[in-house]
Amino acid sequence: MKSILIGLDAFDPQVFEELREKQELPHLAAFADQGSYRHLTISNPAQSEVSWTSLATGLNPGEHGLFDFVHRNPSNYQMLVSLLPTSKSIVGTQFVPPHQAKTFFDQAVEDGYPATSLWWPATFPAKQASPVASIPGLGTPDILGQLGVGSFLSESTDYEQAKYKSRLGTLKREGKQRLTGQLQGPGKMKGGQVEHVMTDFALDLSDAQEPILEIGKDRIVLKPGEWSPIFEVPFKLGRLSSMSGITRAIMPKADSSEIYFLPLQIHPLRSPWPYATPTSMIKQAWQETGPFLTLGWPQDTTSLDEGIIDDAQFLTLCEQIVASRERVFLQQLDQFEEGVLAIVFDTLDRVQHMFYG
């Protein structure tokens, strides 16, 4: 048995058919012409985490238990994020899988075939005992255990935190050509209260065309208006403990001293929670295809909505996310001999959120 599934989140068949008639999607049209083409029934509600879980399990939302982005805790009526349920144990609060239903990935391995799930929604945290190889998609938190917002830092005092979801910060000038700031990291208990760990960074503006971001042990050359490569952000939690996240940075405007960081995301090789399985697979993918963003919603719609980045910068980020997933998929495809290999591309959904309708 050899099955390959390529999922496109928010793919509207009616729009596809209109573009197909105009001969604007020749490759997808060829797939439809060579095989069979059918419309799928839409889940109710028609939400990404509901639809993909129904597709993976063959169950309706009432059976698999995911029926909205927000659920109600029946014990106290508080609202909670359905994709990030937690449980308390002797080791503290831990994330637990958002559903317990059997998927076709599980069925494949029960039947003796390997199965790989790439960026499928509602697959975080990884089930470490499961033989299904997986990289999680929608529902993967940032290193704070939240859905994730970025950090925007500026010399200006005109920005008001109340008007932004993104975390605001101040850049301090040290001489004519140097700015310093801090990134907020995970929290730790101190004196009975949560205190967030901070990491310092600096911007060397000696060359206006290529400012240098100094953070941790890295010196990253920036080009105003362009995204940096993915880099690591270290946080010191205590004498013997530390944590690392990953992010990308951009100086959105060429003529201003402002910098924006994507949400601080899980480093897949140093995750505080079970991120992906098996460890050998994620390590090989990371080292052979290059770093990739790990947040469940990596296309930063918030910063675009708030006017921190512009349309072109957002779309460039989206294209680069697609390219990184393609590299991992093609690497897995090269090794694929039998079983199930599935991947979900969700950038189409994020672009429609911002530009369609």
Give names to the regions the model predicted:
Residues 1-4:
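Extreme N-terminal starter segment of soluble prokaryotic enzymes
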Residues 8-12:
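Short polar catalytic/cofactor-binding loops
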Residues 14-15, 94:
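Second-shell loop/turn segments in exported
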Residues 15-19, 354-355:
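Short, glycine/acidic-enriched capping/hinge loops at junctions between secondary-structure elements
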Residues 17-64, 116:
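Short, structured active-site-proximal loop/turn typified by the sulfatase FGly-forming signature C/S-X-P-X-R
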Residues 59-357:
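His/Asp/Glu-rich, glycine-adjacent segments
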